[in-house]
């Protein structure tokens, strides 16, 4: 039986992208997309080896953003626009982690959804 010729997988080269940082109180998720919103790579604190309460630390966010930045560099990415969502402790350190990988950050935008008196918030914690 003759072998069919296999096509070599063409590697996408994307220079500009958007880094979406979703920082909650329990976790930090970093996702890098192209300009159209198609996902290129993503990383979360749990996937970077942090478990439990250590997932919510700023250091975990920095390591997570660094690993996602490495994957983006493999696609030839150079420039990033950063969009931060959420009130978590890993907001600033995730941006530092992306910057440490050598990616040029063009702008930082806060896209945290703010309700105009929408849903009723959950009850206050009594500790």
Swiss-Prot record:
Signal peptide: none
A GO CC term assigned to this protein in UniProt: ribonucleoprotein complex
UniProt GO MF annotations: rRNA binding; structural constituent of ribosome
Statement: the UniProt record of this protein carries the keyword rRNA-binding: yes
Single biological process term from Gene Ontology: translation
Pfam families linked: Ribosomal_S11
The UniProt record lists the keyword Phosphoprotein: no
SUPFAM superfamilies with a match to the protein in the record: Translational machinery components (SSF53137)
UniProt entry keywords in alphabetical sequence: Ribonucleoprotein, Ribosomal protein, RNA-binding, rRNA-binding
PROSITE patterns per UniProt: RIBOSOMAL_S11 (PS00054)
Entry's family note: Belongs to the universal ribosomal protein uS11 family.
Function comment: Located on the platform of the 30S subunit, it bridges several disparate RNA helices of the 16S rRNA. Forms part of the Shine-Dalgarno cleft in the 70S ribosome.
UniProt-listed NCBIfam families: PRK05309.1, uS11_bact
Subunit-level organization: Part of the 30S ribosomal subunit. Interacts with proteins S7 and S18. Binds to IF-3.
Protein name as annotated: Small ribosomal subunit protein uS11
Gene name in the database record: rpsK
